[in-house]
C-alpha cells in the first residue's frame, strides 16, 4: 500500500552532514511533495540496516560497505542515492601515542571501532602487514572514538576526516597544542583501494517499501536534491537555518565539521557505479560478500541527468586531500572543482 508518511532513520544522532534531510523538512520541500517525513535518530548506529531491512523503518542512512553486507545477510535494503561521497576514513591517532605511519606500530595498541565491520577491516589489514588480529586490542566505541582517544581509553580508532578528526584537532587546540598532531592512517591507502568509497554515506530504503511507493521515493529524492542545491549555493544561510532548528549544531566545533563536510556532499545524489564495483570487490576480499554478489543500488528514482564519472579517481583523491588541508587552515565553504 502506498503512503505519503515516511519514517527516516539517521545513521547517528543529528550531525552536520545530515543537513540536507533536515533542510528539506525545515524549508517545506517535503511538504511541497505532499510527503510527511518523520526523521528519527538511532540509539545504536549498528541497528539502522536491520530496522530498515525489517520494514520497521522505511528509509535511512548508512555507509556503502554496511549496505552491501546487509543485503548479503538477507536484509532487503537498497541504496537509492548518495549523501556524502568518499569522506577520508582511517585510523585516527595522536602524535606521541607511539603510533606512526607504519601500520606495524599498531601492535599492542587498543584500536577503537564503531561497528563490527571496522574490526573486520583492521583484521584484514593485519594479514598484509605481517600481523594477526591478536596483535592488537579491539574496543567497540560506537560514535565515541575521538572522546575515547582523548580520555586515553583507546590509543586510536576508526573515524572520518570531517568528524572524528576535527574533534581531535579542536581538542588539541583547546589544550594549546598543535592541531596537526591529530593524525590518520587512511584505510584506502593501507588497503590499496584507490578510493574511500566504502564509507560513502547513502540514502537507503526497504525493498518492499520502494516497490509499493516508487513515486514517494522519487518525491523524497527530489526534495533532498532541492535541499542539497540550496545548501551548496547558500551554505552559511543553510547552516544558520539548521542551527535554529537543531540548537546542538550551534557550536564552533560543529561549524568546523560542516565546513569540512561541505566538499564531500554529493551534488547529484547519484550512486557512482565505479565506486560500487570497487567496494563490492573489497567486500569479497573481506569475506562479507559471496563471489557472485550483485551490488544493491539503483539510480532509477533520480529524475535529473547523471553526471560523468571522474576520469582519474586517485588524482581526485589527492586533490581532495590538498583541498581539505586548505579548509582545515582557512575554514570557509569551497567545493573541489576538477578540470
From Swiss-Prot:
The active site is at 66. A motif (CCCFC) lies at residues 195-199. Its cofactor is Fe(3+). Pyridoxal 5'-phosphate binds at residues 115-118. The keyword Cytoplasm does not apply. Keywords: Iron, Metal-binding, Pyridoxal phosphate, Thiamine biosynthesis, Transferase. It catalyses: N(6)-(pyridoxal phosphate)-L-lysyl-[4-amino-5-hydroxymethyl-2-methylpyrimidine phosphate synthase] + L-histidyl-[4-amino-5-hydroxymethyl-2-methylpyrimidine phosphate synthase] + 2 Fe(3+) + 4 H2O = L-lysyl-[4-amino-5-hydroxymethyl-2-methylpyrimidine phosphate synthase] + (2S)-2-amino-5-hydroxy-4-oxopentanoyl-[4-amino-5-hydroxymethyl-2-methylpyrimidine phosphate synthase] + 4-amino-2-methyl-5-(phosphooxymethyl)pyrimidine + 3-oxopropanoate + 2 Fe(2+) + 2 H(+). This is 4-amino-5-hydroxymethyl-2-methylpyrimidine phosphate synthase. It comes from Candida albicans (strain SC5314 / ATCC MYA-2876).
Amino acid at each position: 500500500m502506498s503512503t505519503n508518511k515516511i519514517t527516516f532513520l539517521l545513521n547517528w544522532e543529528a550531525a552536520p552532514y545530515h543537513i540536507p534531510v533536515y533542510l528539506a523538512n525545515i524549508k517545506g520541500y517535503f511538504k511541497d511533495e505532499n510527503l510527511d517525513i518523520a526523521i528519527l535518530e538511532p540509539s545504536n548506529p549498528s541497528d539502522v540496516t536491520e530496522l530498515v531491512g525489517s520494514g520497521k523503518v522505511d528509509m535511512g542512512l548508512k555507509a556503502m560497505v554496511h549496505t552491501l553486507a546487509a543485503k548479503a545477510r538477507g536484509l532487503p535494503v537498497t541504496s537509492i542515492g548518495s549523501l556524502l561521497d568518499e569522506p577520508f576514513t582511517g585510523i585516527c591517532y595522536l602524535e606521541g601515542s607511539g603510533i606512526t605511519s607504519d601500520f606495524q606500530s599498531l601492535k599492542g595498541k587498543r584500536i577503537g571501532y564503531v561497528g563490527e565491520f571496522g574490526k573486520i577491516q583492521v583484521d584484514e589489514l593485519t594479514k598484509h602487514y605481517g600481523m594477526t588480529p591478536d596483535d592488537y586490542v579491539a574496543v567497540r566505541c560506537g560514535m565515541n572514538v575521538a572522546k575515547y582517544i582523548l580520555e586515553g581509553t583507546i590509543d586510536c580508532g576508526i573515524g572520518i576526516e570531517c568528524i572524528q578528526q576535527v574533534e581531535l584537532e579542536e581538542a588539541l587546540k583547546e589544550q594549546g597544542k598543535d592541531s596537526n598532531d591529530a593524525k590518520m592512517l587512511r584505510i584506502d591507502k593501507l588497503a590499496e583501494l584507490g578510493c574511500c568509497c566504502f564509507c560513502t554515506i547513502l540514502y537507503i530504503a526497504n525493498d518492499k517499501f520502494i516497490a509499493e511507493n516508487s513515486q514517494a521515493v522519487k518525491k523524497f529524492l527530489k526534495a533532498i536534491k532541492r535541499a542539497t542545491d540550496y545548501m551548496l549555493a547558500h551554505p552559511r544561510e543553510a547552516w544558520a537555518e539548521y542551527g535554529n532548528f537543531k540548537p546542538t549544531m550551534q557550536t564552533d566545533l560543529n561549524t568546523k565539521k560542516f565546513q569540512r563536510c561541505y566538499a564531500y556532499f554529493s551534488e547529484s545524489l547519484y550512486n557512482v557505479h565505479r565506486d560500487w564495483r570497487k567496494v563490492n570487490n573489497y567486500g569479497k576480499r573481506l569475506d562479507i560478500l559471496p563471489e557472485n554478489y550483485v551490488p544493491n543500488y539503483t539510480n532509477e528514482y533520480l529524475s535529473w541527468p547523471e553526471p560523468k564519472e571522474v576520469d582519474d579517481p586517485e588524482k581526485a583523491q589527492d586533490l581532495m586531500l590538498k583541498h581539505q588541508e586548505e579548509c582545515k587552515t582557512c575554514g570557509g565553504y569551497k567545493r573541489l572543482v576538477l578540470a
